[in-house]
Amino acid sequence: MRRRFLKQAVIAPLALAGTGNAAASRQGSAPLRLGLTPVFLVQRARLLEQWRGYLGNAIGRPVEFVLRGSYQEITTLLLSGRVDAAWICEYPFVRHDDALRLLAAPIYRGEPNYRAYLIVPRDDDTTDWIEDLSGRLFAFSDPDSLSGYKLPRYWLREGGRDPDAFFARSILTWSHRNSIRAVADRLVDGASVDGYVWDMLERISPEVTARTRVVLRSRPYGFPPIVTPAGLSLRTSHRLREAFLAMADEPDGQLILEALGLDGFAAVEPSLYDDVRAIADVMEA
């Protein structure tokens, strides 16, 4: 049943075009530009090249990855049509879903969901973060991040606290990885991060996560999705969606998924993000 579900269902600006992709050798094929943000630990040239090649062959045209250092930059590129698709945070998606088309969501540990983690240094005695981190130093990742910014501020607001006055000082790290390292190095007393990123960093750099401790794991939220501008042709959107959905059944796709720590991609309904919409309604009021 799980297999059927899968079938149905701070970094410098950079564009990776690469060579060796059969689709890229076709004369006259304009590349499909796919945006990525630092939320994903895919800053490895070999993996990006393999993924680019897989997607290009699957959709029959070359693919470029366009990387930017903030969610807002990628969102702006999407809304202006300067990228054809992107893997974005769910918070920008729900704020602009009238102008975006939802293609697919990653499947992580069997579900299209992830959790936010509230972390502190390993030897910190924090047990109740809302009480114990008051007046201390805190790291936020990106102003448009649900797990790394909006959610902890929402929790404080719902608890009757002023998010702008709760901490003595807060910093923006511009990536969950940077936030985790800031906590590990005791540059800050706590941070709220994407649990998927923490889990992946535990796998590839356990010496970093070992110097942190998870105080709180949030309820599940819809995993950051793959989206396109609403104006992208339906034919291109369909081909791209099918390429993502087929990854779990293709040997090359399986290798990429393993490196990403994902089970696959699935078609999902916009209602997956209703809880995020409710938070956005409160935070943007």
What are these regions (language model features)?
Residues S29, L34-G56, R68, R115-I180, ...:
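Bilobed "Venus flytrap"/periplasmic-binding protein-like clamshell domains
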Residues Q72-A86, E131, S175-Y196:
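Short helices/loops that flank or line small-molecule/ion binding pockets
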Residues R4-A24:
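N-terminal export signals
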Residues S29-T37, Y108-L118, P206-F244, E258-I279:
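Periplasmic-binding protein-like
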Residues Q50, Y54-A86:
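N-terminal, post-signal-peptide region of Sec/Tat-exported proteins
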Residues W87-A99, R157-E158, A184, D189-T209:
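A ligand-binding cleft/hinge motif common to bilobed small-molecule-binding domains
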